[in-house]
């Protein structure tokens, strides 16, 4: 009698072990896997937006609408080494925040109805963006102005949301209206330490962050070497990144300046824009 009972016990024990394995698998899938996924997602996300002049993104946060102004991300895309290869899609030249479902390509009562700053044609102006402490993935950045008012006007009408095709046409116009680093006399315009001569990123009309693995003042925060919280980000505090650009000999009572940051480490691009006048 002992042998059959022993065999039955072994069968039941094997089934018990299988049940425990299934239960533990379900616990992992339901509890630990999402936490791991969230942790990984948080660790690889880059974050930043235009700060000066006050971008629509900044105004969205200051109005209490945008909970994460640094989170308007175009992803996943090829952001490196070709800086202009990725289509902008719904992000357009002004950015789209999926977290709060905000499309900054369309004006509202909180942004886009008026110019936030007025400049003169050909003026050299200070521009600044804000990079999050936990989201600094290096790379290169630039500022652009589209000089086709008929294109820009589609982004100044609060009753109209530009289509993706119109957003891409605008992005192409902004790319053509790049404001080169080299146009400002005396400004340092180096090449990215993370780019190799011959690659598409080997250019100094764009601005570059410091080397991603630099031992001194690395990545984008190393450009100003400013204190943490020198600008606002919702995740871990921000650092300013400040440069100068020379405006074109062009006039408009209401136009846009667009900021674009291509991340080196991740396949992400950040876009934001500010409403300005050039008179």
UniProtKB/Swiss-Prot annotation:
UniProt feature coiled coil, ranges: none
Task: Indicate whether Kinase appears among the record's keywords.
Answer: no
In the record, Methylhistidine modifications are located at 47
UniProt KW Phosphoprotein keyword: no
Q: What is its main location?
A: membrane
Please give the InterPro entries that the UniProt record associates with this protein: Cellulose/chitin-bd_N, Starch-active_LPMO
The record's cofactor note says: Binds 1 copper ion per subunit.
Localized where?
A: Membrane
Q: Disulfide bonds, which pairs?
A: 68-71, 94-273, 130-231, 146-173, 181-189, 195-201, 209-220
Q: How does it sit in the membrane?
A: Single-pass membrane protein
Which molecular-function annotation in GO is an example for this chain?
A: metal ion binding
Q: Which function does this protein serve?
A: Lytic polysaccharide monooxygenase-related protein that has no activity towards starch. Catalysis by LPMOs requires the reduction of the active-site copper from Cu(II) to Cu(I) by a reducing agent and H(2)O(2) or O(2) as a cosubstrate.
PANTHER family referenced in this protein's UniProt entry, alphabetically: BINDING PROTEIN, PUTATIVE (AFU_ORTHOLOGUE AFUA_1G14430)-RELATED, CHITIN-BINDING TYPE-4 DOMAIN-CONTAINING PROTEIN-RELATED
* Recorded family membership: Belongs to the polysaccharide monooxygenase AA13 family.
Official protein name in the record:
Inactive AA13 family lytic polysaccharide monooxygenase
Species of provenance: Aspergillus oryzae (strain ATCC 42149 / RIB 40) (Yellow koji mold)
Q: Which gene encodes it?
A: AA13
């Amino acid at each position: 009698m002992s042998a059959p009972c022993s065999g039955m016990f072994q069968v039941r024990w094997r089934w018990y072990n299988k049940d425990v394995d299934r239960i533990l698998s379900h616990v992992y899938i339901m509890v630990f896997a999402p936490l791991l996924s969230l942790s990984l997602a948080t660790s690889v996300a880059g974050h930043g937006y235009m700060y000066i002049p006050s971008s629509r993104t900044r105004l969205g946060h200051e109005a209490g609408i945008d909970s994460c102004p640094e989170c308007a991300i175009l992803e996943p895309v090829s952001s490196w080494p070709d800086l202009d290869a990725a289509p902008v899609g719904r992000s357009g030249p002004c950015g789209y925040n999926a977290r709060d479902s905000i499309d900054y390509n369309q004006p509202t009562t909180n942004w886009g109805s008026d110019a936030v700053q007025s400049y003169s044609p050909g003026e050299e102006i200070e521009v600044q963006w804000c990079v999050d402490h936990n989201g600094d993935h290096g790379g290169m950045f630039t500022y652009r102005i589209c000089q086709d008012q008929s294109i820009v006007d589609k982004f100044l009408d609060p009753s109209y949301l530009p289509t993706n095709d119109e957003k891409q046409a605008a992005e192409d116009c902004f790319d053509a209206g790049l404001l080169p680093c080299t146009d400002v006399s005396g400004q340092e315009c180096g090449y990215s330490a993370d780019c190799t001569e011959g690659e598409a990123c080997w250019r100094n009309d764009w601005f570059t962050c410091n080397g991603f693995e630099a031992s001194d003042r690395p990545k984008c925060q190393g450009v100003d070497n400013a204190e943490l919280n020198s600008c606002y980000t919702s995740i871990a505090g921000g650092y300013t990144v400040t440069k100068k650009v020379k405006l074109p000999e062009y006039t408009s009572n209401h136009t846009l300046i667009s900021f674009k940051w291509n991340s080196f480490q991740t396949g992400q691009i950040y876009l934001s824009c500010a409403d300005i006048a050039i008179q």
